[in-house]
């Protein structure tokens, strides 16, 4: 009888991420706040923070491929139309164990910054064009008790340093 091995802790947690960003010149501003699990819960908090706020969907397709869609919080992401656009099969939400194994976060803390915990690039990153075009983007720093604001230069530097080029999709037009 074989036992499942526990998933090892992720390489990066909030503190290690913040130290890594500082060391690599990825400048952002982090605001601590009460835990936020859904976009609607954080609306009042976000009103005081400039920039585009995000919703992040951790998804799996029928072939087992993993996807992270990061979109502006008010963007409609049509999960019936998205597969054709991004080249996937039917999408469904990935489970929490897989989320932790690949991005090193728990439900409610899904974030593009979690891609730093996926050096094997198991997760394909899809970014809403509204975020790609925003002056400032806001993501959880691997925990839903804080939000980190990055200007576009810092965000793109982060992606470049971890070797990620997002697939940019205009979800606003897709929902059309």
Predicted regions and their residues:
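Extended, low-hydrophobicity, polar/charged segments
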Residues: 1-176
